[in-house]
C-alpha cells in the first residue's frame, strides 16, 4: 500500500457526454484510478496519469515564498477547462495526491517515488503536479527505480536556477534536488547527464557556476542565450544532449518565466524564457521518443493573479501531451 496517498473525490471534475468529444473539455474526460487497488493491471495503449505532490516544505526550508502546496489543485482547475484534443484512444487518469502535512520532506519524496514507479508499472505515463521543486527529487527516484539498474536517466530542467546547492548543513530543500541526484548517480558510478534551460545569472552564485564547470556532464543555456538563439537552435542543443541517451525526465519550474507570464511562483522573476518558445522545446523533447515522465512545479496560487500561472502550467501539459500521445512504446 502506498503511503501518504489520497484519492480525489469522484465529483472533483465535471463529467460530460463521452460521445461528444468535439465539445469535450479535459475535466469531462479525465478518469479516476486508485493506485492501492490490488487488482489493477497494466493498461494498453497511450495513457497518462496525473498525480499531485502537495508539499512546499522544501520551499519553506529554502526561505522561499510558500504556497506551492496549493499548486496541484489550481493546475487541475485550469486544466479541466481546456478543450480535449487527444481523441478517443488516449486516456488521462487522475490518481490523486501525495500529501502529508505532518510528514517530513524526505518521507513525502519517498512516497512520491513509489507512486511514480507504480504508475510506470501500470504503463501510465506520469505527469506530476507540484508542489515545490523538491517534487523533482521524488519524481526522479521513482522514474529511475522503474528502469534497469544499468540504465541511466538524463534530466532536462527548464529553470532559472541550477538547484545544485549543497545540503550537508541545511538538509534537502527545493534548491538541492539536482545535487542529490548528482551525488546519488556518482555513488552508483554513473554519470549525471543534466541540461538546464533558462538559467538567470543574477539568480545563481559563482559557487554554482564553478561546480557546473568542474562537472563532466552538466550543460546549460541561460535565458539570454535562449533569447538570442531562438527555438530551432535550442532544439539542436537538446538533440545533441539526447543523442546518446535512452531515457529523459523533464521538469518544468514555472519560475523560469517572467512575472508577466508567471506571477504566482515561489521565486518571482523579472526576466524569463518566452512561454511560446518553451512549448516548442517541450514538444521537441516529447517527439524524441525518449521522454518517460515530466512534472510542472512551483505554481504558488496565493501569489497568482487571475490564475495566470496555473493556466500557464496547464497549457504546458496540454501542448506537451499532444505530441507525447503520438509516441508509442
UniProtKB/Swiss-Prot annotation:
GO molecular function terms noted in the UniProt entry = agmatinase activity; formimidoylglutamase activity; manganese ion binding
The free-text cofactor remark is: Binds 2 manganese ions per subunit.
Enzyme nomenclature, EC number: 3.5.3.8
GO process annotations (BP): L-histidine catabolic process to glutamate and formamide; L-histidine catabolic process to glutamate and formate; putrescine biosynthetic process from arginine, via agmatine
Q: Which biological pathway?
A: Amino-acid degradation; L-histidine degradation into L-glutamate; L-glutamate from N-formimidoyl-L-glutamate (hydrolase route): step 1/1
- Keyword annotations: Histidine metabolism, Hydrolase, Manganese, Metal-binding
Keyword Manganese applies? yes
**What InterPro entries does the record tag this protein with?**
HutG (IPR005923), Ureohydrolase (IPR006035), Ureohydrolase_dom_sf (IPR023696), Ureohydrolase_Mn_BS (IPR020855)
Required cofactor names? Mn(2+)
Name the reaction it catalyses.
N-formimidoyl-L-glutamate + H2O = formamide + L-glutamate
User: Which residues are Mn(2+) 2-binding?
Assistant: 159, 161, 253, 255
**Which residues bind Mn(2+) 1 per the record?**
133, 159, 163, 253
Q: Write out the similarity annotation.
A: Belongs to the arginase family.
Task: Fetch the NCBIfam families from UniProt.
Answer: hutG, PRK13775.1
Q: What's this protein's function?
A: Catalyzes the conversion of N-formimidoyl-L-glutamate to L-glutamate and formamide.
What this protein is called in its record is: Formimidoylglutamase
Q: Which organism is it from?
A: Streptococcus gordonii (strain Challis / ATCC 35105 / BCRC 15272 / CH1 / DL1 / V288)
Upper lineage:
Bacteria, Bacillati, Bacillota, Bacilli, Lactobacillales
Gene name of the record:
hutG
Amino acid at each position: 500500500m502506498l503511503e501518504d496517498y489520497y484519492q480525489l473525490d469522484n465529483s472533483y471534475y465535471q463529467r460530460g457526454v463521452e460521445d461528444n468529444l468535439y465539445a469535450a473539455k479535459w475535466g469531462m474526460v479525465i478518469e479516476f484510478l486508485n493506485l492501492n487497488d490490488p487488482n489493477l493491471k497494466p493498461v494498453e495503449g497511450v495513457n497518462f496519469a496525473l498525480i499531485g505532490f502537495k508539499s512546499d516544505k522544501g520551499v519553506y526550508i529554502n526561505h522561499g515564498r510558500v504556497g506551492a502546496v496549493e499548486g496541484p489543485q489550481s493546475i487541475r482547475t485550469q486544466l479541466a477547462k481546456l478543450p480535449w484534443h487527444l481523441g478517443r484512444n488516449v486516456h488521462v487518469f487522475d490518481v490523486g495526491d501525495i500529501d502529508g502535512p505532518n510528514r517530513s520532506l524526505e518521507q513525502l519524496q519517498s512516497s512520491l517515488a513509489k507512486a511514480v514507479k507504480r504508475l510506470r508499472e501500470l504503463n501510465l505515463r506520469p505527469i506530476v503536479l507540484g508542489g515545490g521543486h523538491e517534487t523533482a527529487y521524488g519524481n526522479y527516484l521513482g522514474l529511475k527505480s522503474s528502469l534497469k539498474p544499468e540504465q541511466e536517466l538524463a534530466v532536462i530542467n527548464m529553470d532559472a536556477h541550477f538547484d545544485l546547492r549543497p545540503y550537508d548543513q541545511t538538509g534537502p530543500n527545493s534548491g538541492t534536488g539536482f545535487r542529490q541526484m548528482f551525488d546519488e548517480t556518482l555513488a552508483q558510478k554513473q554519470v549525471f547527464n543534466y541540461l538546464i534551460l533558462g538559467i538567470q545569472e543574477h539568480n545563481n552564485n559563482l559557487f554554482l557556476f564553478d561546480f557546473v564547470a568542474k562537472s563532466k556532464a552538466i550543460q546549460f543555456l541561460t535565458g539570454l542565450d535562449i533569447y538570442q538563439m531562438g527555438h530551432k537552435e535550442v532544439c539542436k542543443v537538446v538533440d545533441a544532449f539526447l543523442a546518446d541517451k535512452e531515457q529523459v525526465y523533464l521538469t518544468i519550474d514555472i519560475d523560469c518565466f517572467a512575472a508577466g507570464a508567471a506571477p504566482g511562483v515561489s521565486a518571482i522573476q523579472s526576466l524569463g524564457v518566452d512561454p511560446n518558445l518553451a512549448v516548442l522545446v517541450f514538444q521537441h523533447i516529447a517527439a524524441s521518443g525518449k521522454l518517460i515522465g515530466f512534472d510542472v512545479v512551483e505554481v504558488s496560487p496565493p501569489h497568482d493573479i487571475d490564475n495566470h500561472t496555473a493556466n500557464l502550467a496547464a497549457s504546458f501539459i496540454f501542448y506537451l501531451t499532444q505530441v507525447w500521445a503520438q509516441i508509442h512504446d
